[in-house]
Swiss-Prot record:
Function: DNA-dependent RNA polymerase catalyzes the transcription of DNA into RNA using the four ribonucleoside triphosphates as substrates. Component of RNA polymerase II which synthesizes mRNA precursors and many functional non-coding RNAs. Pol II is the central component of the basal RNA polymerase II transcription machinery. It is composed of mobile elements that move relative to each other. RPB7 is part of a subcomplex with RPB4 that binds to a pocket formed by RPB1, RPB2 and RPB6 at the base of the clamp element.
Location within or outside the cell: Nucleus
The entry's keywords: DNA-directed RNA polymerase, Nucleus, Transcription
GO biological process: nuclear-transcribed mRNA catabolic process; positive regulation of nuclear-transcribed mRNA poly(A) tail shortening; positive regulation of translational initiation; transcription by RNA polymerase II; transcription initiation at RNA polymerase II promoter
Principal localisation: nucleus
Organism this protein belongs to: Dictyostelium discoideum
Family indicated by similarity: Belongs to the eukaryotic RPB7/RPC8 RNA polymerase subunit family.
GO cellular component: P-body; RNA polymerase II, core complex; RNA polymerase II, holoenzyme
Subunit structure: Component of the RNA polymerase II (Pol II) complex consisting of 12 subunits. RPB4 and RPB7 form a subcomplex that protrudes from the 10-subunit Pol II core complex.
Name of the featured protein: DNA-directed RNA polymerase II subunit rpb7
Signal peptide (residue range): none
Domain of life from the UniProt record: Eukaryota
GO molecular function: DNA-directed RNA polymerase activity; single-stranded DNA binding; single-stranded RNA binding; translation initiation factor binding
Disulfide bridge positions per record: none
Amino acid sequence: MFFHLTLEKDLHMHPKHCGPNLFTIATQQLYSEVEGTCTGRYGFIITITSVDFLSKGKVLESSGYVVFNVKYKAIIFKPFKGEVLDAIVTKVTNLGFFAEAGPLSIFVSTQLIPSDMIFDAQSAVPCFVSEDGSSKISKDDEVRLQIKGTRVDATEIFAIGSIREDYLGVIG
């Protein structure tokens, strides 16, 4: 799910940047340090939409760097248990398949794939095929899945997904 949140960060800047272009340089540094990162609390920071406040700087006695407190608004992507997402299949194995929904990596185990779909080891491309042959899941296919659980690391979020419910599975 996507959110538009107000966040804050302490930005450490070299004193040589404290000049007439301070706000521009601080904004550029904030973009490069924050966009595309993942925090366990908020999720993936997709993009910064605005910089609302840049505090007066405080000089760190130990290093000489200047610390600014920056308040900004950002678009955040945080997956939740039970959420339904569209994803692209990236890898298929006999244990299940991996898919990606934006920056989120999702694993769908064979236990969470409909029982009528079996792994086809004889195929040129590894895939899951339904017994009647009407449906096939292989690399680069688009699937609709439901998140069953998430695991948060320091810099990534992983999810377990399922296509065993109604209206889930291959799209198209």
